[in-house]
Regions:
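A beta-strand edge to alpha-helix "cap/lid" segment located at domain peripheries
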Residues: 59-69, 73-161
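Short, low-complexity N-terminal intrinsically disordered segments enriched in polar/charged residues
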Residues: 1-22, 26, 30, 149-161
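Hydrophobic pocket/interface hotspot
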Residues: 13-16, 28-29, 36, 51, ...
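Alpha-helix initiation/capping motif
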Residues: 2-5, 44, 94
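Soluble or luminal CAZymes and related metallo-dependent hydrolases
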Residues: 8, 50, 97
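A solvent-exposed, acidic/Ser-Thr-rich amphipathic alpha-helical stretch
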Residues: 26-27, 34-78
């Protein structure tokens, strides 16, 4: 049985990515429930304010060098998905990243309660870190190292005023 599409949740996802494309973290996180759970290969699992702060940090660190495109948005009453592409310079190496991401969402009371991004970590590591990333990007060692770095950055991040 096919689930019925929900235009309000489709619009919620569209608003999230439109805000991201315009570097508006406050508008992005207004789409999130306060009890949001976010997960991706770089940060692992983040909850609540940590998930919200991550988006502000990524936008601030991009220093205007971030291009977001999105599409293939689908949503029902309880879940949704989108495909999106982030183009940016990796802050640690200055290398160009073009990351193709699939997002899955769960909704509660008109907000996003769960957001899971998946992407090819090996390909991302190769773009971000060059030869070392291509060589080691498939290993748990590299995943843990990148995650540790990302979480340290998030823990030390102070939003721009």
């Amino acid at each position: 049985m096919q689930k019925t599409l929900n235009s309000n949740n489709i619009e919620l996802i569209q608003n999230f990515y439109a805000a991201f494309a315009n570097a508006n973290a406050a508008q992005m996180v207004s789409c999130y429930d306060d009890k949001i759970t976010f997960q991706d290969p770089a940060f692992g699992v983040l909850h609540g304010n940590d998930a919200k702060k991550m988006w502000q940090m990524l936008i601030d660190k991009s220093e205007g060098n971030l291009k977001i495109t999105y599409g293939n948005i689908k949503a029902t009453d309880t879940s949704g998905s989108a495909d999106w592409v982030a183009e940016y310079l990796f802050s640690q190496t200055g290398r160009k990243i073009i990351n193709h991401i699939n997002a899955k969402f769960e909704f509660k009371d008109g907000k996003i309660i769960k957001h899971t991004d998946t992407f090819n970590f090996w390909k991302w590591a190769g773009q971000a870190l060059g030869f070392k990333g291509y060589l080691l990007g498939w290993t748990n060692f590299m995943r843990k190292r990148v995650r540790g770095f990302a979480l340290r950055e998030l823990n030390h991040y102070k939003p721009k005023q």
